Each structure stands twice: as C-alpha cells, then as structure tokens.
A protein has these predicted regions:
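Short, cationic-aromatic polyanion-contact patches
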Residues: 3-8, 60-79
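Pre-recognition alpha-helix immediately N-terminal to the DNA-recognition helix
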Residues: 10-14, 26
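Basic amphipathic alpha-helical segments that dock to polyanions
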Residues: 12, 46-50
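Short helix-to-turn junction characteristic of helix-turn-helix DNA-binding domains
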Residues: 16-20
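Short acidic, hydrophobic short linear motifs in intrinsically disordered regions
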Residues: 22-30
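Short helix-coil junctions and helix-kink-helix linkers
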Residues: 29-37
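A short, conserved structural fragment
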Residues: 50-59
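Amphipathic alpha-helical dimerization/coiled-coil segments
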Residues: 76-119
Length: 119
C-alpha cells in the first residue's frame, strides 16, 4: 500500500469497513456520535481520502466506497511500526505485543498455525 492514512482518515475508513458502501451523510452521522466531529470536518476528511485514492465517490447521494482493504492498511501500518520501532525484528515486536498477557487456547492455536505456515 502506498497510501498513508492519518488517524482521522482511518476513522472514516473504519466506518466504511464496518458498514460497507454508504453515504457521506451516514459517515458524518456516525462520526458525530463517536467523535463529536461536525459535518464539514467529516466531508473534508472524506475528500482527502478520495484524493489519496482510498475512497471512491459516486452519485447519487455522495456514496462512498472503500478502495483499500482493512487488511492492506493493517499490514502496511504493522510493517511501518516493525521497521520504525523494532528495527525489523518480528520476534521483538511479537514479544512486545504479547507482553504479560494471558492468551486463550484459540489464540495460541491460531498463532501456532501462523508460525507453521511460515516454515
């Protein structure tokens, strides 16, 4: 992914990823409730996402469609964090993420499956 999204733009994208294609008005309503943003703020951020190629706009009703998948953004953000904070060391990043947390049996099983796929 070559599109860098800021936290405010990710809020817009999260609404689209959660709800699917929807109107700018609906995104504005959701984010007014969640963040207190007014309609102008939300529309400005939607337009910024459109310019970046993250959202496609269509008429009628200023319909918005996500052009970037959540997983693509997650992978790019995780990769950036890995490089910036952990000098590319996956094991150090993983240890920091897990910390002293207790993992469920399902989480452990899923992690083992991921590691086995890498072998």
């Amino acid at each position: 992914m070559n599109v860098k999204l800021f936290d405010s733009e990710l809020k817009i994208m999260n609404v689209l990823w959660k709800e699917g294609d929807t109107t700018a008005k609906h995104i504005s309503d959701v984010l007014k409730e969640e963040t207190g943003w007014n309609m102008n703020t939300t529309y400005t951020l939607i337009k910024r996402c459109i310019k970046k190629g993250a959202i496609e706009r269509s008429e009628p009703n200023f319909m918005c469609h996500a052009l970037i998948a959540r997983e693509e953004v997650q992978a790019a953000e995780a990769g950036e964090l890995l490089d910036k904070i952990f000098d590319g060391a996956v094991d150090k990043m993983f240890a920091a993420l897990i910390g002293g947390k207790k993992l469920s049996k399902d989480e452990i099983k899923n992690l083992k499956e991921l590691v086995n796929k890498l072998k």
